[in-house]
Amino acid sequence: MFNILYAFGWLFTLLPLRVLYFFSDLFYPIVYYIIRYRKSVVRTNLEKSFPDKTQKELRKIERRFYRFFCDLFLETLYEINISEAEIKRRFSFVNIEGLLEQHAGGKGILIMTAHYGNWEWGMNFPLFIAEDIVSCQIYKGLSNKQFDRFMYNLRAKYGGINVEKRELLRTMIKYKSGNDQGIYWMISDQTPAAQKIHYWTEFLHQDTPTLTGTEQLARKFDYAVFYAEIKRIKRGYYQCELIPITLKSAQTTEFEITEKYMRMLQKTIEDEPEYWLWSHRRWKYTRN
């Protein structure tokens, strides 16, 4: 079944993106009004995150989120056949020079991003740097083996190295011993497992458990840390600004990096909330 769906998807993505957006407009009312995909989760998340907004304002954000969600799904499929030239035309970086300056000075780099905008297109970062620079993205395997293979290959399409979470420390030690300490993309807005919650913060008006592994590694190896803020410029076009969180991680206090990241992400979401993945059960744990 997966092979059939993949073949259909592959043929589908031969169409121009503007045609795929026509289908996205058709899918939106089906997903929003009929399937109602995770609507209760989305609605609850929005209501708790923006307690000062009216129901009318919240529903407007909700509808915009689902429209973007349909676009995002087809943009991800479109990546199967997208060319290097088109990726570079549709996705751009700001301050990549500042990041590469730190890397050239011998620093390893950790990039903290989120499920915001088109983060999958951001994984094509290796296209924007020299081929000999080690660029890794942390990859969590999916339960469906065939879909897992599809996403694994898609993310590695343009030279990025997929690193399983359990192999991350070993990989970082390996590259630290060489001339290139590497650049690592981390999707850092996920919910940690209950037994691995070490830090809570107020995020979008709610007590929120946070991942702290990126900070721990940054402080251990004294890597520079950047926040990748992805903005949607217009339909099908994105800009990612690489904002320094710290260039001297070893000098930071415990949870300082995590807290700065969460504040930056909150500002991004508050500015344009419809582009965050509201269907994720981000607040499934409560603080005792």
PLM ranges: what are they?
Residues G105-R166, A193-E202:
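Catalytic core of membrane glycerolipid acyltransferases/transacylases, capturing the structured
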Residues M1-T113, N118, N153, G159:
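Membrane-anchoring hydrophobic helices of lipid-metabolizing enzymes
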Residues Y37, F93, G117, K145-Q146, ...:
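Residue-level recognition of alpha-helix initiation/capping sites
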Residues K60-R63, F128, N153, R166-N288:
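Non-catalytic C-terminal accessory region of glycerolipid acyltransferases
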Residues L15, I34, S49-P51, A130, ...:
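A broad structural signal for alpha-helix termini and local helix breaks/kinks
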Residues I34, R90-F91, L142-S143, E164, ...:
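Residues that cap or flank secondary-structure elements
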